[in-house]
Amino acid sequence: MDAFYIISTATLIALSCGLLGSFLILRRMAMVGDAISHAVLPGIVLAFLISGTRDSLWMLAGAALLGIFTTFLIEFFHKRARLQTDAAIGVTFTWLFALGIILISVFAGQVDLDQECVLYGEIAYVPLDLWITASGQVLGPRALYVAGAVLLINIAFVYLGYKELLLTTFDPAFAASLGLSLSLWNYLLMGAVSLTTVASFESVGAILVVALLVAPPATAYLLTDTLPAMLAATALLAVGISAGGYFLAAWLDGSIAGAIVTIAGLMFALAFLFAPRHGVVTRRWRHRRNRQAVTDSVYRAG
């Protein structure tokens, strides 16, 4: 049963990250997801200091606000200070993440809210943190319910805003001409990324969240040519990576999070090399075959 809880939680988190990560990849904003996953840390700490509790609603609210603030800072530095986007991202997320670490070490050092938990998480402990009702009924791991709720929110967000996300992603100029607010949908997407990130911190940590935001969608991007196909492939990869990572960790008696990232990296490497249309090896083989076909045609014509 523990294995089921761990795999289910990892799968739900991977699905949430992959769903949003697909739009980040298509918008060429993968590093923004990385920035937000680190920069929301001050929001988590400030939410704890204000509320005095680690209740998920406070944490989610703090993270969402910091995620939107991070996006605003990146845009501000890029447009007003004329910094390159990567430089603006680097300055913003390192400063905010360092601020969060200082806040933890100075103000929140007496509680179970530390750098190790935020960075690495520990998904193996998911079955131990149970949701117990007032009557004493055990409903299962709390992280599983949180991950499921966040996934439902993300699915609803993408479903209801699919047309707007599609237009603002692929043709911002046309979307603006239709009256769509590019900034609004950008901030909504970043807010969803923030919620997903903080909901996943305690279970899997920031590093695995970053990997799940980027690796499955990037792999699906190499394997598909349309957005619906990319989203479907991302979902399948999320399930396979989560289950494969758990069993690899069990076989090696190692870190589950590390094994999941390893499987994700292997999947991407295979797609990079052997994807039907975009794989490096596949393209070279196709080019060689076409060249041989042309040579044979010329030879027969001669």
Which functions belong to the PLM regions below?
Residues 138-216:
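Helix-loop-helix "hairpin" substructures at the membrane interface of multi-pass membrane proteins
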Residues 257-302:
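Cytosolic-side transmembrane-helix boundaries in multi-pass membrane proteins
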Residues 1-16:
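Membrane-interfacial amphipathic/re-entrant helices at transmembrane-helix boundaries
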Residues 97-157:
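Transmembrane helix-bundle core of multi-pass membrane transporters
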Residues 23-37, 41-113, 221-232, 249-252:
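Short loop segments and helix-boundary regions at transmembrane helix junctions
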Residues 21, 45-49, 70, 74-75, ...:
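Structural signal for membrane-spanning alpha-helices in multi-pass inner-membrane proteins
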Residues 196-258:
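Transmembrane alpha-helical segments in multi-pass inner-membrane proteins
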Residues 14, 38-41, 63, 67-68, ...:
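Residue-level recognition of pore/gate-forming positions within transmembrane alpha-helices
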